[in-house]
């Protein structure tokens, strides 16, 4: 199931690029930028792009790089800008049903993908709101400046010259959004998004059907004449997902012998012995996410291991595995940028030129997701039972 989803996602990203959908959203999103709200809008813009594409790395390395150039021209500290970029990018990586980490967490916890996304609202929404308030307040320091930057102008000009930017190109994400709201299955929903984008690409961009099919297989490959725009649009396709699929298979191969050898069971029994109550068990399961991540540097390893450790235990305790899948993301996916020696932390430092230590305090979303998830476990707010009902919050239990 997750491998099929990743294949469909790769096809959809490519089709949305050639249909002009992603270029249109990027173009008009960048037009909204204003100096006083630069950090605030940069975070939102990165969120939109990351949600639509499902890739934090792609957002950071394309739009993030452009926004960093704009920030330098405005005299806005790059660590603040990096924080806004990382928060927006990983909000999308966490909440987008197109994201490999989202698919992996749902798969390892054995829960429905879209139900998993909705259950993360309890920790993600408050963490994101705090972050947006921070960026909005910081923006008051930079009012009165003017947007400048070669990369910014080049992207706008390159997108405008290479694509027919129109509201019609926004139809594919609208169709997907409607189907998601109607609670349709993920694969047919994304399939509809691909079909609509395929038609829109032919109608609005004059795209060759054979070229679109080829791009959905091998990824988009076009020359706009502007290197940074090439980086923005040349991605997607089934081939782009092969590394991720390989990692998922490798993680599964890694987790299987751990369980077969008894290693997983030993850890599982140790956790159960320490945890005297379901609350204690879930607290330990959440804490295990960053601990395992620091050791392995990859949630492709930590999520399958956690799924092996805790999924059945959640059933036995009468709690929904959606709580577990949320823990995997709050303690795993969004923690990756904080680990300097991890792939994600090293990638961000190399791309934006800022270390995790420098942007730590400007990305509260990253660590507040963990905090709000912990509060959910302790208080019972936003915690779901195995039968689908919500746990009675602690303060109501005391009152009664």
Predicted regions and their residues:
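Alpha-helical transmembrane segments of multi-pass membrane proteins
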Residues: 36-49, 75-94, 280-293, 317-338, ...
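N-terminal alpha-helical transmembrane segments of multi-pass membrane transport
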Residues: 1-26, 137, 141, 166-181, ...
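Hydrophobic alpha-helical transmembrane segments
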Residues: 3, 39-44, 82, 125, ...
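Juxtamembrane helix-boundary/capping and inter-helix hinge elements in multi-pass membrane proteins
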Residues: 1, 75-79, 105-117, 260-263, ...
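Membrane-embedded alpha-helical segments and adjacent helix-loop junctions characteristic
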Residues: 1-72, 224-312
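Juxtamembrane and boundary regions of transmembrane helices in multi-pass small-molecule transporters
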Residues: 94-97, 105-157, 345-400
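Alpha-helical transmembrane segments of multipass membrane proteins
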Residues: 11, 44-48, 69-70, 132-133, ...
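Hydrophobic transmembrane alpha-helices of multi-pass small-molecule transporters
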Residues: 1-6, 122-130, 136-250, 391-400
């Amino acid at each position: 199931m997750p491998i099929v989803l990743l294949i469909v996602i790769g096809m959809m990203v490519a089709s949305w690029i050639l249909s002009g959908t992603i270029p249109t959203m990027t173009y008009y999103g960048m037009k909204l930028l204003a100096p006083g709200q630069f950090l605030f809008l940069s975070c939102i813009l990165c969120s939109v792009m990351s949600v639509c594409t499902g890739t934090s790395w792609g957002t950071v390395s394309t739009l993030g790089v452009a926004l960093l150039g704009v920030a330098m021209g405005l005299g806005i500290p790059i660590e603040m800008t990096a924080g806004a970029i990382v928060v927006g990018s990983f909000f999308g990586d966490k909440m987008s049903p197109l994201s490999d980490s989202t698919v992996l967490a749902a798969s390892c916890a054995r829960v429905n993908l879209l139900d998993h996304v909705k259950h993360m609202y309890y920790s993600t929404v408050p963490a994101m709101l705090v972050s947006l308030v921070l960026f909005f307040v910081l923006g008051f320091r930079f009012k009165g400046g003017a947007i400048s930057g070669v990369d910014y102008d080049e992207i706008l000009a390159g997108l405008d010259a290479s694509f027919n930017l129109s509201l019609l190109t926004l139809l594919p994400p609208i169709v997907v959004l409607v189907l998601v709201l109607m609670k349709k299955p993920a694969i047919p929903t994304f399939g509809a998004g691909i079909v609509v984008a395929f038609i829109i690409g032919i109608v609005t961009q004059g795209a060759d059907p054979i070229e679109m099919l080829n791009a959905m297989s091998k990824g988009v490959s076009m020359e706009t004449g502007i290197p940074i725009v090439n980086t923005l649009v040349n991605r997607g396709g089934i081939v782009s997902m092969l590394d991720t699929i390989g990692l998922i298979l490798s993680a599964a191969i890694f987790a299987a012998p751990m369980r077969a050898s008894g290693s997983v069971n030993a850890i599982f029994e140790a956790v159960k012995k320490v945890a005297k109550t379901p609350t204690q068990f879930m607290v330990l399961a959440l804490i295990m996410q960053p601990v395992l991540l620091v050791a392995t540097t990859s949630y492709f390893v930590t999520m399958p291991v956690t799924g092996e450790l805790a999924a059945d235990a959640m059933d036995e305790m009468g709690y929904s595995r959606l709580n577990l899948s949320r823990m995997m993301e709050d303690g795993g996916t969004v923690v990756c940028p904080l680990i300097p020696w991890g792939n994600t932390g090293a990638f961000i430092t190399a791309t934006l030129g800022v270390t995790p230590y420098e942007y730590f305090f400007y990305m509260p979303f990253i660590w507040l997701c963990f905090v709000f998830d912990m509060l959910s476990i302790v208080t019972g707010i936003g915690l779901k039972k195995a039968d689908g009902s919500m746990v009675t919050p602690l303060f109501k239990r005391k009152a009664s």
